[in-house]
Amino acid sequence: MKRDLLLTKIEEYKNIMPWYVLDYYQSKLSVPYSFTTLYEYLKEYKRFFEWLIDSDLSKAARIADVDLTTLEHLSKKDMEAFILYLRERPSLNTYSTKKGVSQTTINRTLSALSSLYKYLTEEVENEHGEPYFYRNVMKKVATKKKRETLAARAENIKQKLFLGDETMAFLDYVDKEYEYKLSNRAKASFRKNKERDLAIIALLLASGIRLSEAVNLDLKDVNLNMMLVEVTRKGGKRDSVNVAAFAKPHLEAYLSVRKDRYQAEKQDVAFFLTAYRGLPNRIDASSIEKMVGKYSESFKIRVTPHKLRHTLATRLYDTTKSQVLVSHQLGHASTQVTDLYTHIVNDEQKNALDKL
């Protein structure tokens, strides 16, 4: 979704929310949570508050009037009824045969509510320095995780990674072959953004930074002499991230055309730009997602920018066999989340079976 449209929709949701949700929004904006995350959370709150009113658990006539005491006194049974409602409600998609929403959607809803309840019961302060209330019913609500071993997840992800020579082959394909599949009109559009698109893909493959981190890069954050980028990690922490050398020529090529191609002025500090009605703007996440999907589908298989992050992490672990190094590169506080990459590159088990 374009940034302007995203912000417009966020304002629409804010206009119907209770005051304490607006407090929550302002607090999380300072962390900072991404606008995309906050938008998704506001959607979940709207659905939850509508259910509270429809179920007579709140006497409010509109969402903005749902008071804090309603949330404070909801029971575990009430929350389980909401989960059952999500699981059993008719799908909003006319063409779907599913009866309710997916478990992934339910987990996202519960995550949003857990975040709100934690804010209201632990993080916020009233005039007396106390939270608005203390009873957090979400701590009693169990979530159902997707049943899948690391090995199974690794095998599924592996098919969507550009490992080994495929990393450079993908870049070469976009650089030298992709345009020959296009019409003359499409070629003109491709050539206009070719250097930028290659720079984005190369940076993601060479650093493993998140999509949001790439979008929010400013010119001052990129040091091509040291091959470092400064990013804002989850939780608002600043971090210096090393970038593999193979990205340098693509980043340099983009910088050489950035000013003239996108009519960039001194005040246009965003590193990656797009032209909208002749004016330079920071590129948004949805544009990068579509761009990566388009090129990767033409090359091999449609993937997301996050799979390019997985690609870097897997290649780095395959080379170093160090989960600590990989976790530092990705900006993770522990090595637990990097266990996945050990399974992707772990051929020892297969080799042992072959010898039986």
UniProtKB/Swiss-Prot annotation:
Residue span(s) of domain Core-binding (CB): 16-121
Highest rank taxon of the organism: Bacteria
Coiled-coil segments: none
Subcellular location: Cytoplasm
Primary location group: cytoplasm
Database matches in InterPro entries: CB, DNA_brk_join_enz, Integrase-like_cat_sf, Integrase_catalytic, Integrase_recombinase_N, Integrase_SAM-like_N, Recomb_XerS, Tyrosine_recombinase_XerCD
Function in brief: Site-specific tyrosine recombinase, which acts by catalyzing the cutting and rejoining of the recombining DNA molecules. Essential to convert dimers of the bacterial chromosome into monomers to permit their segregation at cell division.
Similarity comment text for this entry: Belongs to the 'phage' integrase family. XerS subfamily.
Name of the protein in question: Tyrosine recombinase XerS
Gene source species: Streptococcus equi subsp. zooepidemicus (strain MGCS10565)
